[in-house]
From Swiss-Prot:
Binding site residues for ATP: 30-33, 51, 87-91, 415, 496
Record's protein name: Chaperonin GroEL 2
Source organism of the structure: Nitrobacter winogradskyi (strain ATCC 25391 / DSM 10237 / CIP 104748 / NCIMB 11846 / Nb-255)
Primary location group: cytoplasm
Gene Ontology terms: cellular component: cytoplasm
A molecular function (GO) term: isomerase activity
Length: 545
């Protein structure tokens, strides 16, 4: 085990504070509509330009081990806020820096760190209660567009795209962001359920021009196993032919005699049929087939359930208004599943999302949820250069998470005003002793930091602006740093999702109070590089000449 370097008390906190300041100062220049860009060096390719707080925070590693520990703790604040609400990373970093700075002064003055922490916790509870009390529900498309615009640093085009996407796929629908190949940003919406499996044979194609299968009012057979022999399928095929409706077969695979017979029947025009492979693998495939069954009002045919293919009746098949299959994807639109069944399945998947610890599983579950709940929207972000596209994609990602958060918990005035107003409530908090009171006061002072920083980034005097905002009683009254005017921020469209502001203050206070109560720090000493061993002597030992 290598030797360690240990620092205590003021020494440790000073080093840690320096690290906190370096990271927070780099991140906070991006705050607000007039925030500046940060250029990040890449080991290969062009440098990356960003205004996204968490992206900047993730790039910072410091040489000094103790300073780096402080910086990494604050980086955790930004990451946690990004994970929970998808935005508010810079606000959280600014708050954490302000709380740590004031807290360290109080500890140095001899106050009890644990009482300070209790005071901070009391203050945060009061702030969260005040935010939820003043939160306004988001209902209209315009409000969603406003939230998206603010989070995308005032880019109204991004706000509009997000509002359109949410309108089309619903609040539960999946919105993915991709890089476009062109200059234009565009929105592409897939209605219904789509999975990434195409037709097994091109002979099933009905629309030769677009090379895809299009079937209206189709039956859907959902089978878990391979289909290779046709005998077990014959009774069902005859029943489908008599209805005159088309049939889509979703199975692990269709091969040999079964595939040949289906293709021949399709070409002769006796049976409108198409076959696709089942999506996913293993247990995930079973779950996805069950999703398709619930969406279409059918039953997944599985030997686990004791259902044999020869016993399948028309009632066990799913139905859909339209099925489209191309070379790579299958889309089922307007399945005939019962609304109550689909809602129950959605609730079940939501519960699994809450429980899972794996990010990959969560992503896959959210995809399944979206396919059941509404559909998938893809925003393709365009731009003139690769650097511009990447920077814009960052902002679209931020804005997408912010709009989701706004729909979930509502909105409050932006520009740091909601936290400023909450700071007024902290004057009424009753504490058990003076040190706890100081803890509350630390948070009260810190709550003005985001509004102050937004003003500073806009070239104004932060303290003057904070003073002017607090002079007015009106909750939504604040400073619009884009135009330099004061007024009602909600009616101006300057708004923040309540969830973003809430997670920012909770995460900032959580990490900051841990830093304040730190009394010792342990880091590895750098290894001394020993000189390389001398080269062995030349010649060929043991040889007689």
């Amino acid at each position: 085990m290598s030797a360690k370097d240990v620092k205590f008390g003021v020494d440790a906190r000073d080093k840690m504070l320096r690290g906190v300041d370096i990271l927070a100062n780099a991140v906070k220049v991006t705050l607000g509509p007039k925030g500046r860009n940060v250029v990040l060096e890449k080991s290969f390719g062009a440098p990356r330009i960003t205004k996204d707080g968490v992206t900047v925070a993730k790039e910072i590693e410091l040489d000094d081990k103790f300073e780096n520990m402080g910086a990494q703790m604050v980086r955790e604040v930004a990451s946690k806020s990004a994970d929970a609400a998808g935005d508010g990373t810079t606000t959280a970093t600014v708050l954490a820096q302000a709380i740590v700075k004031e807290g360290a002064k109080s500890v140095a003055a001899g106050m009890n760190p644990m009482d300070l922490k209790r005071g901070i916790d009391l203050a945060v509870e009061a702030v969260v209660a005040d935010l939820s009390r003043n939160s306004k529900k988001v209902t209209s498309n315009e409000e969603i567009a406003q939230v998206g615009t603010i989070s995308a640093n005032g880019d109204s085009e991004i706000g509009k795209f997000l509002a359109d996407a949410m309108k089309k796929v619903g609040n539960e629908g999946v919105i993915t962001v991709e890089e476009a190949k062109s200059l234009e940003t565009e929105l592409d919406v897939v209605e219904g359920m789509q999975f990434d499996r195409g037709y097994i044979s091109p002979y099933f194609v009905t629309n030769a021009e677009k090379m895809r299968v299009e079937m209206d009012d189709a039956y859907i057979l959902i089978n878990e196993k391979k289909l290779s022999s046709l005998n077990e399928l014959l009774p069902l095929l005859e029943a489908v032919v008599q209805t005159g409706k088309p049939l889509v077969i979703v199975a692990e695979d269709v091969e040999g005699e079964a595939l040949a017979t289906l293709v021949v029947n399709r070409l002769r025009g006796g049976l409108k049929v198409a076959a696709v492979k089942a999506p996913g693998f293993g247990d995930r495939r079973k779950a996805m087939l069950q999703d398709i069954a619930i969406l279409t009002g059918g039953q997944a045919i599985s030997e686990d359930l004791g259902i044999k293919l020869e016993n399948v009746t028309l009632q066990m098949l799913g139905r859909a208004k339209k099925v489209m299959i191309d070379k790579e994807n299958t889309t089922i639109v307007n399945g005939a599943g019962k609304k109550a069944d689909i809602e129950a399945r959605v609730a079940q998947i939501k519960a699994q999302i809450e429980e899972t610890t794996s990010d990959y599983d969560r992503e896959k579950l959210q995809e399944r949820l979206a396919k059941l709940a509404g559909g998938v929207a893809v925003i393709r972000v365009g731009g003139a250069t690769e650097v511009e596209v990447k920077e814009r994609k960052d902002r679209v990602d931020d804005a997408m998470h912010a709009t989701r958060a706004a729909v979930e918990e509502g909105i409050v005035p932006g520009g740091g005003v909601a936290l400023l107003r909450a700071s007024e409530q902290l004057k009424r908090i009753k504490t058990q002793n003076d040190d706890q009171k100081t803890g509350v006061e630390i948070v009260r002072k810190a709550l003005s930091a985001p509004a102050r920083q937004i003003a500073i980034n806009a070239g104004e005097d932060g303290s003057v602006i904070v003073g002017k905002i607090l002079e007015k009683e009106q909750y939504s009254y604040g400073f619009d740093s884009q135009t330099g005017d004061y007024g009602n921020l909600i009616s101006k469209g300057i708004i923040d999702p309540t969830k973003v502001v809430r997670t920012a203050i909770q995460n900032a206070a959580s990490v900051a109070s841990l830093l304040i109560t730190t009394e010792a720090m342990v880091a590895e000493l750098p290894k001394k590089n020993s000189p390389a061993p001398a080269m062995p002597g030349g010649g060929m030992g043991g040889m007689d000449f």
